[in-house]
From Swiss-Prot:
One Pfam assignment: SYY_C-terminal
Source organism per UniProt: Pseudoalteromonas translucida (strain TAC 125)
Single GO biological process annotation from the record: tyrosyl-tRNA aminoacylation
Compartment(s) where it occurs, according to its Swiss-Prot or TrEMBL record: Cytoplasm
Coiled coil region boundaries: none
UniProt-listed Enzyme Commission number(s): 6.1.1.1
Residues annotated to bind ATP: K228
Enzymatic class: ligase
Name by which UniProt lists this protein: Tyrosine--tRNA ligase 2
Family: Belongs to the class-I aminoacyl-tRNA synthetase family. TyrS type 2 subfamily.
One Gene Ontology molecular-function label: ATP binding
Short motif ('KMSKS' region): ranges: 225-229
Catalysed conversion reaction: tRNA(Tyr) + L-tyrosine + ATP = L-tyrosyl-tRNA(Tyr) + AMP + diphosphate + H(+)
Length: 399
């Protein structure tokens, strides 16, 4: 693969590269680069949002570079404060190691285990000792740490910041020194920590790593980042039928975002899919191909085909129209009453009409389940097809 094509694949779906010219020079050198991406095993199950970064690791792996999957068993016991307005509860060593094993099983559904180096940052951090940690802490100031957005907000609002939380970016940066990383991958929310690695490498006389930031993947609601707590996630260990249904529930616009960040298709392949839609192919068919690809990756080709067959059978049984309006209803609370949701979506003229239709059994969820509870609360982050009567349909996301 020529340099320009390789660079285009690396840049695909990335948010920012610091510094791109440095990356180009590293690629031109012909040297096998060491690509680092760190994961704190704070939760045992991965969802598709996590795989955006792992897919980028796979890109580098396919280009012949050395990929280091760094399990932050040491940092996991500190607790990453990124994006949090409260101090995270640290995990026990037993929790961290158990979660790390689950992580490895899951990432090797994407990465080639024979070409992946799995490292644990406790290897060097425990050897650093108390004196080494104090010397490391002396490299930065409290003022510098307070430049981090989450720390800044907590400090301004009078919320406590534990001293150990200031150490987290330094430890992550020191990982890059220990590994002599050429490139570090991370989400946009990790910017401060990733740049810390560059600073510490310079201090140690190493060439600073190139930082590549990937975006945070939106969940099935198309609004907020994919998260278990928001209920808008697609787990890579989800049952094939569940995964298929969730992928089919995303909007046609979000589908292309998922293709960009999750699909193994080349840029040319994705452009060919877009061309098919422009020439009249139903976007639903393109979405089906994406669902089958992802299920085959995390389960098997047979599971993907079975999930597809099940979906088609259920879809035809429901007799839903091919084109259903997609809309988002934004709420401030954690849930919305079903009658209010139907009114907001213009499926009924009033909440009283909604209540009446529910009592008559004329409101269905996803084409088959009748809604009979007038007090039903619909959770924020959910996406479903709502039907009122025989002719009114809407694919509604509550955000």
């Amino acid at each position: 693969m020529d340099l320009q094509t390789a660079l285009a694949e690396i840049k695909r779906g990335t948010e920012e590269i610091l510094i791109e010219d440095e990356l180009v020079e590293k690629l031109k050198s012909g040297k096998k680069l060491k690509i680092k991406a760190g994961f704190d095993p704070t939760a045992p199950d991965l969802h598709l949002g996590h795989t955006v970064l792992i897919n980028k690791m796979k890109t580098f792996q396919d280009l012949g570079h050395e990929v280091v999957f760094l399990i932050g068993d040491f940092t996991g016991m500190i607790g990453d404060p990124t994006g949090k307005n409260v101090t995270r509860k640290p995990l026990t060593r037993e929790d961290v190691l158990a979660n790390a094993e689950t992580y490895k099983e899951q990432v090797f559904k994407i990465l080639d285990p024979a070409k992946t180096t799995v490292a644990f940052n406790s290897t060097w951090m425990e050897n650093l000792g108390a004196a080494g940690m104090i010397k490391l802490a002396a490299r930065q100031t409290v003022a510098r740490m307070l430049e981090r957005d989450d720390f800044k907000k907590r400090y301004a609002s009078g919320q406590s910041i534990a001293i150990h939380e200031f150490l987290y970016p330094l430890v992550q940066g020191w990982d890059s020194v220990a590994l002599e990383a050429d490139v570090e991958l991370g989400g946009t929310d990790q910017r401060f920590n990733l740049l810390m690695g560059r600073e510490l490498q310079k201090d140690e006389g190493q060439k600073p790593q190139t930082v590549i930031m990937t975006p945070l993947l939106e969940g099935t609601d198309g609004v907020q980042k994919m998260s278990k707590s928001l209920g808008n996630y697609i787990g890579i260990t989800d049952a094939p039928n569940d995964m298929f249904g969730k992928i089919m529930s995303i909007s046609d616009v979000l589908m292309w975002r998922y293709y960009d960040l999750l699909s193994g298709l080349s840029i040319a392949g994705i452009n060919a899919q877009k061309e098919r839609v422009e020439q009249g192919t139903n976007p639903r068919d393109i979405k089906i191909e994406l669902a089958k690809e992802l299920i085959a990756r995390f389960h098997s080709e047979a599971d993907a085909q079975a999930a597809h067959d099940d979906f088609i059978q259920r879809f035809q049984k429901k007799a839903l129209p091919d084109e259903i309006p997609e809309l988002t209803v934004t709420i401030e609370q954690d849930s919305i009453l079903i009658a209010n949701l139907l009114k907001e979506a213009n499926l009924v003229a009033s909440t009283s009409e909604a209540m009446r239709m529910i009592k008559q059994g004329a409101v269905k969820l996803n084409g088959e389940d009748k809604i009979t509870d007038t007090k039903l609360e619909i959770a924020k982050g959910s996406t479903a097809i709502y039907q009122v009567g025989k002719r009114k349909f809407a694919n509604i996301t509550v955000a």
